[in-house]
Amino acid sequence: MSTKPTDVVSPISDEILPPKVSAADALSAGRAVYDKPTPENSIMLFIDHQVGLMSGVRDFSSLAEYKSNVTGLARTAKALKIPVLISSSNAQWQNGDTLLELKEIFAAEPIYRRTGIINCYEDPTFRQALEHLVSTTNRRHIILSGVTIGTCCTFPTLSMLQDGYKVFPVIDACGAWSAYEAQAAISRMASAGAELVTTFALACELQADWKRPTANDMLAPFLQNLPEYGFVLQNFWNNANQHAVKDPFGILK
């Protein structure tokens, strides 16, 4: 006779539980506050992902991996309907055009073309666009990626932290000329209070529950750009004979 206990399967009606302690009480107790990014409170910035600049990135095993992370992040924003702002710097010269996939994914979005100011947050036109988006949506969690982590990502991150934003740099959707640049930038941003994230983990944090209606739309970034979990999804889909499984947990009566 088997002594194996029966698995406990949570009800499919379960919803996400918030922390038991309020943010104010956690702060007063000296604890960290988990003020996480969500599709409802976030804005996503793509800074200077231009083909000329991307060609100089040296801290990835391949530029294909780097490009895949950037486009995976973009597809995540698209799937979850997170507002985005895209900026470029001197695109008419050596920096080159914005990555084609970004332009295709966000075909309805303008590109804010800076003409010399390196820190996008210090550019009056771009900051005006961001502040307008913040005021009209009441979103103050800024998810940020930049072509170079030491400049395009770090500089606006430090500026926005000073102005009271919650900033989440997506460090594997940023490149660097060297490992030293990446290490210095990561240390600098973390020390200033930024919450560093990665493309895959951020996508999971934003989705939060695979029972949410956005789950189907979130398949695209995982299948196309985040194979670490995309392979798992494909395996399930194939084993299910490529049709939806009505009762994957076997709990419906």
Regions found by a protein language model. Name each.
Residues S2-I117, H132-T137, Q183-A190, Q207-A208, ...:
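Active-site acidic carboxylates
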Residues F106, L130, M160, G164:
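Active-site catalytic pocket residues across diverse enzymes, especially alpha/beta-hydrolases
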Residues I111-R114, E195-A201:
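Short acidic-hydrophobic, aromatic-tinged amphipathic segments that line or gate anion-handling sites
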Residues T115-I118, D172-G175, L202:
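Short, acidic/turn-prone active-site loops that include or flank metal/cofactor-
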Residues G116-P124, V147-T151:
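A general structural motif
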Residues T125-A129:
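Short glycine-cluster motifs
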Residues R140-T199:
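A contiguous pocket-lining binding segment that forms or flanks enzyme active sites
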Residues T199, L206-Q207:
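Short linear, low-complexity motifs centered on an aromatic residue
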